[in-house]
């Protein structure tokens, strides 16, 4: 009976145990994909940090990379000679080009030399080389697997490598290593794959030249990794024209503190946040027009403002009982609370007993805060400019409406609103968006030499009236000066623009277009 049941069933082929050679090549498929994607994420992140326009940078970098991989896959048909030697040669080339790409791009931007052409040349080079490698791997493994099995194994490992890279890049690599060292670390990983291939196939590959090339490349990448922090500081000093006194990559941003003479400047992701020589103009203009218009402001919320400079101005008002600062980056608030010179700049505001610092995402914190808690008399949004979708969402009607639930009926919401000169459309887009959320608005602007003409908006549910009195000891604002801040010249006057909505993020487009126009 058993013979009758099994006679029509084809016998399954025996599972052959894989040797070290095929296992190394399969592992290479995973690592090649991970390395390639990391190189492109590094390039896209660095370009968005330095040039802005995050959506366009990442879209064009990833699109160019995938296109280049297609070119490489087509070119693989023309690769002649020993496929194993060619694979090792290409792996070394990928490690060197990809590993040093962030360093080259940073240096090019700091020197003002052909940054964007170099960006896409490097992306094309890495994509073409990796596009060649995958067909070569299949060629090398075709004797160990049936075709269907080979394709599924190689491609599944390739996609798995991409997944792993996309997860560890933002969660561990960039916060721990930074962009330059991340690129160099994965360059070293490519060279390790080359070494492993040379060793496992040493009986077949008698190529001392490849060993030498791999060793020299490994040494160069290791030296670059060891010197990466010094290189980054030197590049930043050249770019920002000052001495780096502190620089770190946090989970959220690149923080660079520069000093030139007696002036200290803070940069986040390459964008100036303040200069100690004139920050008082910005922070006085941000805080006092609203605070002085309130009879007895007691409870204040600051979103962003981890440098404590806006809090310093808020604490000039004796009626203030509590200030809550919600800033996502603990390393920034710790720096401005613990570093003596910076703490002196903000007058120790973050250590004041009335001040509570919360390191959290502003949107999530507000959603979690019970509406039964006492509302705030004023909210100050001292956030970075809306240069990407992550920041642009904090300038949207849903966020403004969320803030309104935590604001007193006669309270004020104040935001910095970029430059009405350089980014005129973006400035008036913020005004329009606040009005779309149900607020009345009072836009104004002030000249801050480090920034230029800078805009602000006061939003409220009752009419705003400029105060006739301000705190004593201000260096910039007087009641007479304050009244002039609400006057706009014809070249900064209101424009008809769209409101910023979460699905379209028109504000980010306006902002990028305005600042690109200003740079040109």
Task: Explain the meaning of each model-derived region.
Residues 463-520:
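SAM/dcSAM-binding transferase cores
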Residues 2-330, 334-342, 347-449, 454-463, ...:
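Alpha-helical transmembrane segments of multi-pass membrane proteins
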């Amino acid at each position: 009976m058993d013979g009758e049941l099994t006679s029509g069933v084809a016998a399954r082929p025996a599972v052959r145990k894989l040797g070290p050679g095929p296992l190394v090549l399969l592992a290479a498929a995973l690592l090649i994909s991970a390395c390639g994607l990391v190189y492109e994420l590094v390039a896209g992140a660095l370009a968005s940090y330095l040039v802005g326009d995050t959506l366009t940078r990442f879209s064009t970098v990833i699109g160019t990379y995938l296109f280049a991989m297609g070119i490489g896959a087509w070119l693989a048909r023309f690769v002649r000679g020993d496929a194993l030697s060619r694979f090792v040669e290409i792996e070394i080339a990928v490690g060197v080009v990809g590993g040093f790409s962030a360093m080259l791009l940073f240096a090019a931007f700091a020197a003002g030399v052909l940054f964007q052409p170099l960006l896409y040349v490097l992306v094309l080079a890495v994509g073409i080389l990796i596009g060649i490698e995958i067909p070569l791997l299949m060629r090398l493994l075709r004797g160990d697997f049936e075709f269907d099995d080979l394709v599924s194994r190689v491609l599944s490992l390739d996609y798995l490598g991409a997944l792993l890279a996309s997860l560890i890049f933002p969660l561990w690599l960039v916060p721990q290593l930074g962009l330059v060292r991340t690129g160099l670390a994965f360059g070293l990983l490519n060279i390790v794959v080359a070494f492993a291939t040379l060793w496992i196939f040493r009986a077949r590959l008698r190529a001392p030249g490849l060993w030498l090339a791999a060793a020299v490349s490994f040494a160069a990448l290791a030296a670059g990794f060891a010197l990466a922090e010094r290189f980054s500081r030197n590049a930043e000093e050249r770019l920002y024209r000052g001495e780096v006194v502190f620089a770190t990559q946090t989970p959220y941003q690149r923080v660079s503190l520069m000093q030139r003479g007696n002036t200290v400047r803070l940069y986040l992701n390459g964008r100036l946040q303040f200069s100690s020589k004139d920050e008082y103009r910005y922070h006085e203009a941000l805080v006092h027009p609203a605070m002085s218009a309130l009879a007895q402001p007691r409870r204040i919320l600051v979103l962003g403002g981890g440098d404590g400079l806006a809090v310093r101005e808020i604490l000039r008002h004796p009626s203030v009982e509590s200030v809550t600062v919600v800033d996502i980056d603990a390393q920034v608030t710790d720096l401005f609370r613990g570093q003596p010179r910076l703490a002196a700049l903000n007058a120790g505001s973050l250590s004041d007993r009335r001040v509570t610092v919360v390191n959290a995402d502003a949107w999530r914190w507000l959603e979690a805060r019970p509406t039964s808690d006492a509302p705030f008399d004023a909210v100050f949004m001292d956030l970075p400019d809306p240069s990407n979708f992550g920041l642009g969402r904090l300038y949207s009607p849903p966020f403004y409406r969320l803030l309104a639930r935590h604001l007193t009926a006669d309270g004020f919401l104040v935001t910095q609103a970029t430059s009405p000169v350089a980014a005129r459309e973006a400035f008036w887009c913020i005004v329009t968006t606040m009005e779309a959320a149900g607020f009345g608005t009072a836009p104004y602007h002030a000249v801050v030499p480090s920034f230029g003409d800078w805009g602000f908006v006061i939003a409220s549910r009752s009419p705003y009236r400029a105060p006739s009195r301000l705190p004593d000891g201000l260096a910039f604002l007087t009641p007479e000066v304050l009244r002039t801040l609400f006057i706009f010249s014809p070249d900064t006057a209101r424009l008809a623009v769209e409101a910023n909505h979460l699905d379209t993020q028109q504000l980010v487009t306006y902002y990028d277009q305005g600042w690109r126009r200003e740079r040109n």
